[in-house]
Amino acid sequence: MASKVEQEIRDLREKIRYHEYRYYVLDDPEISDAEFDELIQRLIDLEEKHPGLVTPDSPTQRVGGEPLDKFDKVEHRVPMLSLGNAFNEGDLTNFARRIYRLLDTGKIDFVVEHKIDGLSAILTYQGGRLIRGATRGNGVVGEDVTANIKTIPSVPLRLKKDVDIEVRGEVYIKKDDFSKLNERRLKKGEEPFANPRNAAAGSIRQLDPRLAAARPLSFIAYDVVAYEGEGLQTHVGALELLRELGFKVNWYRKCDDITEVVNICKDWVDKREELPFEIDGMVIKVNELGLREQLGATAKSPRWAIAYKFPAQQKTTVVKDIIISVGRTGALTPTAVLEPVEVDGSTVSRATLHNEDEIRRKDVRIGDHVLVQKAGDVIPEVVKVIKSKRDGSEQIFHMPETCPACGGEVVREEGEAVLRCVNVTGCPAQRREGILHFVSRNAMNIDGVGPALIDQLLEKGLIEDYADLYYLKKEDLIPLERMGEKSATNAIEAIRASKDRPLFRVIFALGIRHVGLGVARVLTEKYRSLSDLMRASGEELVAIDEIGPTIARSIIEFFKEPHNREVINKLKEAGVRLEEKENGKEEQNLYLSGKTFVFTGKLDGFTRSEARDKVIAAGGKVTSSVSRKTDYVVVGDSPGSKYDKARELGVTILDEDKFKEVLKAGDNNG
């Protein structure tokens, strides 16, 4: 028989679980925050006095444990495949036709759900207790993030029934919570998150669960992967089971035919603003689980489900000013300064205008009312001017005749749309951007050396170029703002560790125009040291696959410049490794090896050459035409005939978000 204390602890846990469910799942609390806090504090007091009565599923155990060194890998019981994409009504109709053809049946019910813009997670319960939470990873292997999953209040630590079940769902942050989170970060002088999805993904992958607990994460369940109970017959049945077990469940609607599905998808394009969280589309699934088994899956996606992607959201605002930034290669890029406006979950106050030709083509003027849109994490762009709102006060913008950073000459090279500052070695903006590029993740990956520190180092004359970083001492950094001894020590250690980066990363870090990470990797297959590459002739370079005359000329000109040779010599003297290791075993993460990509349409987050470069850097191949041998067709805005060809041949189609997921999965598993 339980003692009085044991019984009180049990009662408290039941009460707390009930009120957590009312508050975090039903959004319908029955008691005040103060009353809830009293219950929690009473339970904490009792468990501290009686530690032998603490159980893993107690509400007090949501946050605990020491920070991890790394996340363990988890192999999923059932692979978590990506969904195919539908971009319009025709794609949805074709999806339904394929299913009817494969099943040869009269009636099929579909279920339509919100596609929440967050991070997928897989939760495993045994006997009703949460034993593991994992990320999707690459779909086959994810990461064990149980300690962080437990901190999410809407994740039940104990289900309402003692069942064995594996659940899939989405970790996300509500719009209001995201705004408050960014306000707190700004007050602390921290960089705000770009959007709720980034914030959720970054939070769930914190090695210290206390940091995850401080973020306002939520969880919605949307599927049952495995269930050791009475057989489920339908997806709707699975969702209702999840609701009965205590989960917050995704909104859904059962539809009798694809016409109803299409209408619901169209309705939510506008209605999504009403939701408290971000969605970037709808998911359509066959309802009957038996039919799903018959349909099966390809190697990449299930045949019984598809994601309908919303078009990029557009909002109206005003151009307050047009400013010019100077990049590391001297390009002068115009940016519109906007009246702040909410677009796709984040406040937009700037938008790229790309170049002078784009400004002229769209006739963008200071004072104009414009439509802006953003997709993913990239800087938004001005789509078009609303000329009907002009009142005559708008000002025509003219590109500067000299560099705004150094006053140097600017030129527009033949065949290019951008103006460039030709003061390569003397322009402070190019110097700063070059150093930022050098320390970036894909280059030398020097953690803790970011824009704020680099600005101080330049301002105080402690560095003039990226090679000078290797001559810094801890004593140089300690007096700087927001540093201190620990931060200074960490920065110096990170700089020292970067001396042994693979040669292809060093070549990329140098900032040679037109030489991305993929081209850098290709170069190291032929040239085993930087000195070998510096001696290469133009004829040798153009003979290499992926290297054309433009890239070859850029490489030759870079190494001809005395200043660049001087900086490289400083790198060598500082002990930076400028050759491949003798055993030839360099850092390799060729996760796209053997995969062929084709691109069509305009991408928002990459130029075509940047996207191509990322594929090549990961061992993949990019071709210009679609065939049965093509693995992926990446589709941007206004795709051409390649998109139709891919659909005809059944080639996997990736929108830009899915393409980013492919790249990110490779990064996470490299």
Swiss-Prot record:
Active-site residues are 115
Name any Gene Ontology BP term.
DNA replication
Matching InterPro entries:
BRCT_dom (IPR001357), BRCT_dom_sf (IPR036420), DisA/LigA_HHH (IPR041663), DNA_ligase (IPR001679), DNA_ligase_AS (IPR018239), DNA_ligase_CS (IPR033136), DNAligase_adenylation (IPR013839), DNAligase_N (IPR013840)
Q: Which residues bind Zn(2+)?
A: 403, 406, 421, 427
A Gene Ontology molecular function term for this protein is: DNA binding
- Which Pfam family, giving just one, matches this sequence? BRCT
- So what does this thing catalyse? NAD(+) + (deoxyribonucleotide)n-3'-hydroxyl + 5'-phospho-(deoxyribonucleotide)m = (deoxyribonucleotide)n+m + AMP + beta-nicotinamide D-nucleotide
Tell me which cofactor or cofactors this protein depends on: Mg(2+); Mn(2+)
As recorded in UniProt, its EC number(s) are 6.5.1.2
Domain BRCT per the UniProt entry, residue ranges: 587-670
Tell me yes or no: is DNA repair among this UniProt entry's keywords: yes
Q: Which UniProt keywords apply?
A: DNA damage, DNA repair, DNA replication, Ligase, Magnesium, Manganese, Metal-binding, NAD, Zinc
Question: Does the keyword field hold Zinc?
Answer: yes
Q: Which Gene3D superfamilies match?
A: 5' to 3' exonuclease, C-terminal subdomain (1.10.150.20), 6.20.10.30, BRCT domain (3.40.50.10190), DNA ligase/mRNA capping enzyme (3.30.470.30), Helix hairpin bin (1.10.287.610), Nucleic acid-binding proteins (2.40.50.140)
PANTHER family, per this entry?
CHROMOSOME TRANSMISSION FIDELITY FACTOR 18 (PTHR23389), DNA LIGASE (PTHR23389:SF9)
Q: Which family does it belong to?
A: Belongs to the NAD-dependent DNA ligase family. LigA subfamily.
What name does this protein carry?
DNA ligase
Query: In which organism is this protein found?
Result: Halothermothrix orenii (strain H 168 / OCM 544 / DSM 9562)
Q: Which gene encodes it?
A: ligA
